[in-house]
Amino acid sequence: MCGIAGFYGFEDRPLLKNMSKACLHRGPDGEGYYTNKNVMLASRRLSIIDLSTGDQPIFNEDKSVAIVYNGEIYNFQELRMDLERKGHRFYTNTDTEAIVHSYEEYGAGCLKNFNGMFAFALYDDNKKQLLLARDRCGIKPLYYTILKNNSLLFASEIKSILQHPEVKREVDSDALNHFIRLRYVPGRKTMFKGINKLLPGHYLVASKKNVKIGKYWELDIGIDESIDENSAIAKLRNLMQNAVKMQMISDVPIGSFLSGGLDTSTIVAFASQASDRPLNTFCMGFGESTDEFEYARVIADKFKTNHKELAVKFDLFKEFPKMIWHIDMPKRNLYPYLIYKEVRKHLKVIHSGMGGDELLGGYVHRYAYMDYISSSNGKKNNPEIIYNKIFSKEEYEDKIAKIKKAKSPAEAYSFITSADAGFDAEQLKDIYSEKMKSKISKPVSGEFEEYFRKKGFSAAEQAFYAEFNVKMPNDFLIVEDAMSMANSVEARVPFLDNGLIDFCFSLPARLKVNNGTGKYILRKMMSDVLPKKISRRKKWGFSTTTHSLFKSELRDIAQNMLPDGFLVNKKYINKNFIEKVLKEKAAKSNTQNYNLLWNLVAFEIWHGIYIKPAKFHKPDLSMNSFLK
């Protein structure tokens, strides 16, 4: 695991050093460089496997192929045996070297053979080509930009790319619209105009002639309606067991998050089976009513883990700029940053439960909404069954009213997938200026359209597909990677194993969401392994609400930063709207607006770090430095 950076088409050793230094936190255990007149590569190493000989770059036998790499290929031992039979000679015990020899044998076709998380840059000196590639799901990030002379810069983090003085730091208006509407930026765009993500399951080839991008994998959702429940349980158990066992490979101590929820408890159960010593487990608490210590203890006791309860005390806004600095974009979810900060005090590899919801139907309310709007009588899977225990009648009716106005399933989903059921066109008239409206080139729903064109699938199954391809890689996985690597921790995600993904997307919706119960098949599978209070436990979240935050700190911070901030001064957001929300008495019915204010505060901090300075540099990241 590490951070990578580099460029193709020119030489600049000081720039390469600066790009590497910018992502030092991703790999504090070592650094390595590869340079020639065509390409320059840098690696920061967080040593996990083969601690003695695993330094990068790593080469093939004649050193005509060089690689810098971020991630883990969990099936590398199987790949190595196959390659050795074909005559390849290995000099290390790393998974990195398996990539090099796989490329020699299969070219870019090797990518489909890798089971793991990865982003890498591989230079072939014989072909004078640079190959960039990213894993199927987008677990590991990779960003790039193309300069005027057709040269290419790439890195694990955008701050490394910004070390080049010719890279423009401009806000992308479409990305800003997506961020305001969804809280994340889908697709290839980032908040920086001209700096792109390499999409999951894609590769890029840079040569002296051009830059080409290709897709080596996409999710196939062929549903097997014939599978019965018992067969599905048996297959899922076998795949889960193998996935967790593969992801136990490490030359340093490894642990697992344990919230007491279904996903982490499942991982701990299988990891304990695969380990010859007590597993290290961690449960975090923030002094909230939703702290999960009680549930985690049940699982820790059952599997006799080496369990730690970490009570995190924090000032919510104190760490806010640091979190934004590490993720290179406006975000407001601080919990992962604080969690990984605590984990790093104990170890540097940990299993996360990420992906369980996306594969097995954890977001029940979203799927209920989609089935509701797609049914002819509006009664099928009425989401009120689920939502009336979460929202007031007024909030529920507001959400349904917005969704009913949607012109397409994709537009409805764009409302549903945003945490606040989205802003509709009427609301945006008050929020956006005419300038902002004129700069938006396509609707937010356009990012979801292709996933709802799939014929022969239920609305819920189409939503599963969109969830996996859009929100998971562009929101959850970006946060997971940035916040773990900010603290030099490798987060592994067993649910996002190749075999598990393929199998779970062949399951019919009835085995994922059944009678209002999400992750039905996983609950059934674990019912004879986990205590009932865990296997039947519903999804839980943090209790801090934006409404309570608005009453305490958010109103004052928003008042300080927004009325005279970039978005108002440059006429993206209407000042009257902001002042109206700030003047109104705090009320739960205004939660959607408070969420927006919090997003805008995050944007202003991001802008103050990345766009406003005449020259990009790491600034003072104390919250006071962003307040007037």
Q: What does each model-found stretch correspond to?
A:
Residues 79-87, 443-459, 505, 571-590, ...:
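Short amphipathic alpha-helical segments and their helix-coil junctions
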Residues 1-72, 101-221, 237, 241-245, ...:
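N-terminal glutamine amidotransferase
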